[in-house]
Amino acid sequence: LTEISVVFILSIKLKQITVSGAIILRKNPETSRPEIFATQRGYGDFKGGWEIPGGKLEPGETPQKCIVREIREELATEVKADKVIGVVDYDYPTFHLTMHCILCTIVSGDLKLLEHEAAKWLNKETLRSVDWLPADLLILPEIEKLLISA
């Protein structure tokens, strides 16, 4: 690459996408072990990849309000946004993702899959058994801490 092309490449600004992701934590009803809810994308470039459920912030929306709305829309479930456990920044090839990862508890509903292909409850042993999307991989150490301390 020439110096000019390097400067040009570095000056290209990636599209910024800001999302909230729900870390829905529960105790397994049979084993009492802590586990989190993971979903498999059912559409788009990342179809088939696993993620914590969530979606894009709307203008003027807080990450907490966003995650409550997104889980209602995607999973027909009401959650309480408890606290942000981390913020992930990741550069995909065509956009920069900022993901607010929010610990959530279920208030009501049965987590119906309205947009996802599949879902699983994962514990500390099975957490890394699915093919996580690259940005979601970055929050796994924090999720592991939650699963150990819960």
Question: Which ranges hold each PLM region?
Answer:
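Conserved N-terminal beta-strand and adjoining loop/helix that marks the start
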Residues: 11-36
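Generic C-terminal helix-cap and adjacent flexible tail
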Residues: 144-150
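N-terminal amphipathic/basic-hydrophobic helices that include classical n-h-c signal peptides
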Residues: 1-12
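NUDIX/MutT-family hydrolases
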Residues: 103, 112-143
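Active-site-adjacent beta-strand/loop module that shapes the phosphate/pyrophosphate-binding cleft
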Residues: 17, 78-80, 87-110, 118-120, ...
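Conserved Nudix-box catalytic region and its N-terminal flanking loop in Nudix hydrolases
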Residues: 33-73
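Hydrophobic packing within well-folded, soluble alpha/beta domains
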Residues: 63-71, 84, 102, 119
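Conserved hydrophobic "DFG−1" position in protein kinase catalytic cores
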Residues: 24-25, 38, 104, 121
